[in-house]
């Protein structure tokens, strides 16, 4: 007992340590007059390559004296490629600062080359003051008739305007001037100034200035929601027609008691379609362990996405650096019980015997896929010396969360699912000899049904994908989680409806291999999203270089894997309910 109690305490402390930096930061700090306000320098990098970021002092700016003070902002902040360092610039609350020298900068050939390379790559930097971001460019290229490439100039003065309401900082803005040409052997002073301006804006509304209302609340966004909603109405109507009309007629003919031999023979000769495969439709799927694992994982991801969206709506997670990532990781660990429960129940109902394999695969499939992609990307980031490289300590924390929270919960869920919901309950008995599957037209084959099944679900989220991609890859803050919730619900409904229709046509073609077909029919949505990401990369961005290209397609691959597993599980579970419903009332031998 003591050991289990100690483990519970350790887990609790771990979760507290992860969540506290995100939700209890300096953002609610109240300052006294002339109290020191810290300006944190964060990162620099090419503007067109959002993930290619480096330590601010990787450029030859003059560094603070002594040991650099770092700010730990939580797991999500580190995974987001942030490293906040105290600039040690003297800024005091409500005290204006005229032009003052930060430090003298002596230029040599190496420093000039470094700055010129950064300017040619449109390097930008990011600072933070009281958890509010400031951005600026390192320098710029001025046209020069004596030079083909133009004249490289470095901004040497930073003017910081701070708006405050009583004892709280509301808004910060950075402007730069005094551009100086970069020439080896010269010396220039890096200077700054601070201006404090009172404002009536409340602390609760201070982040509004960073939200792009015209972009996210454009009429095309509303139109896409309406269009997807109409698609839901159409598809639910189609499924209802199948259930209420076609199947009702089939039931009436199949269940009719008729003593007339001639009529009975005629009915038998006319009988075809889904009714003929009732003795095979509940035959266990091939690779049952894998199917159970992906369906369980997909059910967990569906619940996870719903929880994170709701928490983002209630808690405005977009305000905190890395808050979404931290919330996602912690919620993933805590919802791992769901994946085990769904997987274990499904595997038991299908008569599975390899329980250890099922438990381990369910608990580790998606995390290890992400770890594999992340390891490759991390290797690239380490080679480039980028802040995107995950520190070893952070890797240990993530592994501890998985090993001591997620993995045990998934195992527990599998055991509970096996014992509580694992009793076989098939409406029809499975025949000993499998029925041969007749040849059908090409468009009724499982591969075609699977590939076509993702088109309509992709169409329902197509516009939202543009807003999500633009937020992640083009420096916009995504805050319309109400839209995302609507789109997610629409995606689930459309996926279920499309998969049910595909399953019905497949069974009517006397093909009883519906389990994997229903999964891939829904999962193929992710294929279309990945194809769209390729279009987005070449048409909507100006990314370049091996580093950014690797991260773009690597992150997109992770996202599409999760989306595919989620949609596949939703499609399978919907089809499973449909199949059990239509075979429940027919007379099985």
Curated annotation (Swiss-Prot):
Q: Which residues lie on this side of the membrane: Lumenal?
A: 25-222, 315-321, 386-395, 470-481, 540-550
- Membrane topology per the record? Multi-pass membrane protein
Q: Coordinates of motif Golgi retention signal in the sequence?
A: 587-589
**What UniProt keywords are attached to this protein's entry?**
Endosome, Golgi apparatus, Membrane, Signal, Transmembrane, Transmembrane helix
Tissues in which the UniProt entry reports expression: Ubiquitous.
Query: Residue numbers of motif Endoplasmic reticulum export signal?
Result: 578-583
InterPro entries (alphabetical): EMP70 (IPR004240)
One cellular-component annotation, GO: endosome membrane
Entries under Pfam families matching the protein: EMP70
Q: Where in the cell is it found?
A: Endosome membrane; Golgi apparatus membrane
Keyword match S-adenosyl-L-methionine: no
Q: Where is the signal peptide?
A: 1-24
Q: What residue intervals traverse the membrane?
A: 223-243, 294-314, 322-342, 365-385, 396-416, 449-469, 482-502, 519-539, 551-571
* Effect on the protein of changing residue 583 to A: Abolishes export from endoplasmic reticulum
Q: Which residues lie on this side of the membrane: Cytoplasmic?
A: 244-293, 343-364, 417-448, 503-518, 572-589
Family label: Belongs to the nonaspanin (TM9SF) (TC 9.A.2) family.
**What does the entry's domain section say?**
The C-terminal KXD/E motif functions as a Golgi retention signal, certainly through the binding to the COP1 coatomer.
The name this protein goes by in its record = Transmembrane 9 superfamily member 1
Q: Which organism is it from?
A: Arabidopsis thaliana
Gene assigned in the entry? TMN1
């Amino acid at each position: 007992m003591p050991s289990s109690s100690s483990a519970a305490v350790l887990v609790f402390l771990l979760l507290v340590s992860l969540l506290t930096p995100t939700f209890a930061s300096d953002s609610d700090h109240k300052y006294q007059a002339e109290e020191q306000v810290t300006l944190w320098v964060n990162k620099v990098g090419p503007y067109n390559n959002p993930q290619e970021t480096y330590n601010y002092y990787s450029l030859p700016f003059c560094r603070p004296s002594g040991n650099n003070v770092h700010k730990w902002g939580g797991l999500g902040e580190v995974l987001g490629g942030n490293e906040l360092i105290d600039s040690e610039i003297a800024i005091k609350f409500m005290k204006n600062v005229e032009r003052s020298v930060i430090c003298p900068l002596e230029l040599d050939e190496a420093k000039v080359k470094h700055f010129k390379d950064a300017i040619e790559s449109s390097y930008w930097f990011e600072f933070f003051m009281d958890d509010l971001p400031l951005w600026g460019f390192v320098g710029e290229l001025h046209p020069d008739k004596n030079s083909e490439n133009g004249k490289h100039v470095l901004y040497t003065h930073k003017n910081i305007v701070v708006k405050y309401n009583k004892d709280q900082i509301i808004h910060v803005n950075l402007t730069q001037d005094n551009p100086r040409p970069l020439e080896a052997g010269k010396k220039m002073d890096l200077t700054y100034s601070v201006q404090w301006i009172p404002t009536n804006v409340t602390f609760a509304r201070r982040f509004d200035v960073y939200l792009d209302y015209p972009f996210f609340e454009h009429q095309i966004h509303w139109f896409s929601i309406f269009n997807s909603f109409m698609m839901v109405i159409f598809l639910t109507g189609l499924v209802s027609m199948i259930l209420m009309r076609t199947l009702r007629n089939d039931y009436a003919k199949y269940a009719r008691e008729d003593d007339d031999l001639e009529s009975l023979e005629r009915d038998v000769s006319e009988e075809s379609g889904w009714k003929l495969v009732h003795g095979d439709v509940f035959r266990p799927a091939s690779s049952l362990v894998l199917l159970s694992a992906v369906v369980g994982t997909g059910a967990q991801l569906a619940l996870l996405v719903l929880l994170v969206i709701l928490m983002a709506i209630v808690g405005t997670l977009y305000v905190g650096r890395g808050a979404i990532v931290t919330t996602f990781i912690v919620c993933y660990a805590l919802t791992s019980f769901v994946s085990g429960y769904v997987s274990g129940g499904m595997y038991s109902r299908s008569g599975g015997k390899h329980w250890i394999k099922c438990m381990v695969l369910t608990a580790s499939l998606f995390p290890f896929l992400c770890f594999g992609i992340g390891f490759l990307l991390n290797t690239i980031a380490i080679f480039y010396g980028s802040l995107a490289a995950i520190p070893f300590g952070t890797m240990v924390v993530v592994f501890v969360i998985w090993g001591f929270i997620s993995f045990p919960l998934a195992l527990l869920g599998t055991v509970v699912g096996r014992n509580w919901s694992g009793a076989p309950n098939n409406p029809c008995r499975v025949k000993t000899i499998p029925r041969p599957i007749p040849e059908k037209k090409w468009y009724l084959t499982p591969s075609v049904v699977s590939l076509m099944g993702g088109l309509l679900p992709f169409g329902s989220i197509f516009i939202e994908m543009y807003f999500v991609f633009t937020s992640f890859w083009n420096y916009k803050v995504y805050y319309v989680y109400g839209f995302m919730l609507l789109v997610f619900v629409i995606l689930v409904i459309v996926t279920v409806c499309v998969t049910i229709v595909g399953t019905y046509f497949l069974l009517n073609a006397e093909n009883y291999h519906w389990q994997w077909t229903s999964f891939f029919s829904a999962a193929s949505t992710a294929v279309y999203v990945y194809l769209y990401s390729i279009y987005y990369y070449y048409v909507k961005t100006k990314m370049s270089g091996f580093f950014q290209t690797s991260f773009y397609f690597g992150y997109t691959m992770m996202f599409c894997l999760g989306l595919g597993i989620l949609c596949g599980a939703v499609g399978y579970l919907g089809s499973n309910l449909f199949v059990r419903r239509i075979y429940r009332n027919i007379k099985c031998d």
